[in-house]
């Protein structure tokens, strides 16, 4: 289910609670509604995917295409040659407004596809806590006895090549580490750069490595109201936003500069 509401103007808050067959269309309509109601004063968009457990893979691809004009969105990789595929955006009409995406420990699967793609491609700042870490694709094999076998077919990979399965997507800004939103500055934003680079460089982390990394921004330490406050603060300060979005990107050329 999807919905839209506006917080303190001129910022639009769009909530995505799942990825069903109508999600992309509903998102597109919500953005157009905000543009029509607010006009040129619209400073940016907050896409709230907290506790979004995912849904249809093709809808995750379509939602990402709303904001990524070309290049890799995500890829899948497994043992079978047919499981290896790269999903690229070929969209000619993309939304270019500044954007913040909210996630938490219950944001999973399709929501993580979108968050990882927008972060890697320098298209959005991710705010909140580390996401759930569901980064695999399953297929159902029907058995002769009318039973079913659920087979893990492939892993999902972000544009940078890391898999968030069990690891999760690490936010650009971890809510738990921001004590005073009014004092959020460039130093605070830049502090997470090295950690994000390490996170995105992981390919096959051990269980201990996963556990230690997830402790950096624990999923259970989210603060819903503070997430919105941080997102609003970023969108009202173009310089701060530009620095924040670049801390998580692997595509430096696509990230905004100030």
Label every model-predicted segment.
Residues 1-9:
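Short, small-residue-biased leader/transition segments that mark boundaries at the very start
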Residues 8-258:
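C-terminal "post-core" interaction segments
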